[in-house]
Each structure stands twice: as structure tokens, then as C-alpha cells.
């Protein structure tokens, strides 16, 4: 939901909207929308697939912090939507073909590493599940709810991986999910 064309409802029929911005006065910019240990960014300057130096409007590529310490910091934007919000464009306009209008899209989207070793996170779980190998994501039009199916789901009991299940998943309210994160692996 961090693409500003979606948030401004430019492509609701095509790709949905965003709960980050209901309208210009009712938006989540600057608000805590995730746990303070969550930082996420889109970075087209990283080497590899999804990398570029300039977007398809000629804007220099740069890292765009979507969430920093759980606070919604910026939307991915293009020149038009950046002007509407009164901010600088962040190089997120891309097109699959030269004759098509560039759309605002994520590049290399990263959740920044946390402080904890993944094994210590599992060891701290009394009763839960470890979900591995996502398969099919599904998200509501407003991006408020989501479902992700997984290849493997391990039961966790008293800090130990246990029974293996196939084809499980998770369904959640996006806001509740992001606010309830209490550990991020390194």
C-alpha cells in the first residue's frame, strides 16, 4: 500500500487502494503503524534484479524509507504524485514497455535486519508457528487484510520446532500484524 498512485486512488479498479491514505487529511504519514523495531525500505540502488540508476521519468534512483522505526515515513511516488504531496520524487516510476505510462512500483523492498538471532526468537516462543517458504499472497483491495500461504509450517512448543504441516498460512489485519511484531531476526 506504499505506492502513492494507489493511495491517491488513481488505480483502484486495477490494483487496489491503501489504508495508509484515506484522503489528503486522513493519512498515516508520520504515524506509528508498525512496531518500533520494524524498518522497511525500497531500494533500486542495490545490485541485482530490480536495480536501476534512473526511473522511467528520469528521476535518480534512491532508497525510499517506507517505514522507519515503525513510523510511515514516505510513499513511493512519481513526479505527479510527489507534487500533490509537496515532496521530492523518489524514483519509483517504472514501465514494462516504452509506449506505456510508467506506474509507481516497488523495487527491492527490504525489511531491515533486527538484533536477534533467528534461533533465539524461536527459543522465546512458548506456543506458536514458524512459517517457511511463502507460496501465494492475497491482499484485500484496501491492503488492510492479507493472507499468505506457506510451503511449510512448523509448530513451536516451548521454544522447539515440532510437528511439520504442509500448505498452511496466515491471515491477519495488516495493522494488527505489524503492530504486534516483537522480534526481528538479524
Language-model features: where?
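N-terminal small-residue-enriched
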Residues: 1-186
Amino acid at each position: 500500500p506504499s505506492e502513492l498512485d494507489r493511495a491517491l486512488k488513481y488505480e483502484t479498479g486495477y490494483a487496489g487502494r491503501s489504508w495508509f491514505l484515506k484522503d489528503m487529511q486522513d493519512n498515516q504519514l508520520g504515524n506509528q503503524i508498525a512496531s518500533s523495531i520494524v524498518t522497511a525500505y525500497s531500494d533500486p540502488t542495490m545490485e541485482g534484479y530490480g536495480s536501476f540508476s534512473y526511473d522511467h521519468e528520469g528521476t535518480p534512483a534512491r532508497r525510499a524509507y517506507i517505514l522507519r522505526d515503525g513510523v510511515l515515513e514516505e510513499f513511493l511516488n512519481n513526479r505527479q504524485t510527489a507534487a500533490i504531496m509537496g515532496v521530492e520524487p523518489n524514483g519509483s516510476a517504472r514501465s514494462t514497455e516504452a509506449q506505456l505510462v510508467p506506474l509507481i512500483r516497488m523495487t527491492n523492498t527490504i525489511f531491515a535486519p533486527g538484533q536477534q538471532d533467528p534461533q533465539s526468537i524461536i527459543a522465546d516462543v512458548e506456543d506458536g508457528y514458524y512459517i517457511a517458504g511463502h507460496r501465494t499472497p492475497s491482499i484485500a483491495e484496501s491492503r488492510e487484510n492479507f493472507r499468505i500461504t506457506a510451503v511449510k509450517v512448523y509448530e513451536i512448543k516451548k521454544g522447539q520446532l515440532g510437528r511439520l504441516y504442509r500448505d498452511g498460512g496466515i491471515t491477519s489485519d495488516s495493522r494488527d500484524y505489524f503492530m504486534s511484531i516483537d522480534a526481528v531476526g538479524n
